[in-house]
Amino acid sequence: MGDLALLSCKKKLALQCSRHLYQQEIDHLQLTFLAEGKQGTTIISPCISRGEQQIATACIEAHIPFIVLLVGGFPPYYKPTPLYLQACAEGRLLLLSPFQWQNEKITNMRQRCLYLNELAKRICEEANKKG
């Protein structure tokens, strides 16, 4: 859901931060990603940890192109948050998931998170090779 052209952007940067970071470390990373985004870099992340979610929100609010990899897939009749919906409508956001929606509790959450972080890195590496 969103603008598939974001996958073709030449410069991408994966956002991954530990859930154990202090707030000041997250704030520092946020400044780094905002600066990269303002230089034309598309940010990509599964937005799993609190820090990743905070940085993603700040980037999207700053009109920085962003790709979100959803850990749980798309539920039926999925409607993104107003922030995501507006960014999608403006061509600044792409929501992707390699997983089908499942209503049950996800039992392999750690493996999914690791996979999505690796996928984000690979997408960035491929784009940066071409650029």
Language-model-detected regions and their locations in the chain:
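Glycine-biased, small-residue-rich flexible motifs in mid-sequence functional cores and linkers
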Residues: M1-G131
